[in-house]
Amino acid sequence: WGEEREIAVLFADLRGFTSLSEEQLPYDTVFVLNRYFAAMGAAIEEAGGHVDKFIGDGVMAIFGLQGDFELAKQQSLVSAVNMARALDRLNESLADDLPQPLRMGIGIHAGAAVVGEMGYGSTLGMTAVGDVVNTASRLEASTKEFGAQLVVSEAVLGNTKAEDPCSERHEISIRGRRGMLAVRAYAAATDVIRQTATG
């Protein structure tokens, strides 16, 4: 089956892991990645999200498969906070095994997408395609440009205070998309809790 639905999409990616993995044995790289994926998967599911797929050292998650769009947006933000805290705990437990702490970037966007069972054979699974997915991926990539852990579109945040001290507001262009997209960049993903609690 397939249908159009309003959802929130989250992308997260480890920063500098490729160069980090070159300094480690293959077994150690797999061990660290599996610990990371387990921690991120649990953080996403605890917030009510669906882990769509793991790609390299990144993860894509979908929120809103049950149909509540406002709840989906809130869940995606809670997930980002959960993931940041889970990464901190993971870094503590792996401190003796890593030359430096793991870092990640998270991008979140919300809007209409086509949702359904897609794939082939054993890869068949629930996923989403469309502009909202591409945009969320682009926002994750923009965390590097802004030196932020989290970049989230104002479509997700809703009524955002202009004077929000926890974030920087930017307008960015997305390839294949008309106009500029208003986003908020947070140096620490946990800062979004303060903003949404008072916004």
Task: Set out the residue ranges of the language-model regions.
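Catalytic NTP-binding/metal-coordinating core of nucleotidyl cyclase/transferase enzymes
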Residues: 1-78, 126
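Nucleotide phosphate-binding site architecture
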Residues: 18, 60-61, 114-115, 157-158
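Residues that recognize and position ribonucleotide moieties
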Residues: 7-10, 52-53, 106, 149-150, ...
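Catalytic strand-loop-helix junctions within cyclic-nucleotide turnover domains
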Residues: 62-72, 106-126, 143-146
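Cytosolic regulatory/linker segments at or just downstream of nucleotide-handling modules
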Residues: 113, 142-199
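Short flexible coil/turn linkers enriched for glycine and charged/polar residues
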Residues: 3, 100, 112, 120, ...
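Alpha-helical scaffold within the catalytic cores of cyclic-nucleotide enzymes
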Residues: 33-49, 65-106, 131-142, 165
